[in-house]
């Protein structure tokens, strides 16, 4: 499976993306959902995702 990390500072948007995408059905594993850039960086270091989906207007 391809490991995905999601980062978005808007909780509603982040939760909707996490909830409504059939990650496993697309051969993906969601390894984390971060609420800010610092949290995303830590998750990238420890969880080693193949792809990071980032909100570019995030603190």
Predicted regions and their residues:
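Active-site residues of response regulator receiver
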Residues: 8, 55
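Two-component/phosphorelay signaling modules centered on CheY-like receiver
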Residues: 11-32
């Amino acid at each position: 499976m391809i490991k995905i990390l999601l980062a978005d500072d808007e909780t509603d948007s982040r939760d909707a993306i996490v909830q409504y995408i059939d990650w496993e059905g697309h051969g993906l594993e969601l390894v984390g959902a971060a609420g800010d850039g610092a949290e995303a960086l830590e998750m990238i270091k420890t969880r080693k995702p193949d792809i990071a989906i980032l909100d570019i207007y995030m603190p």
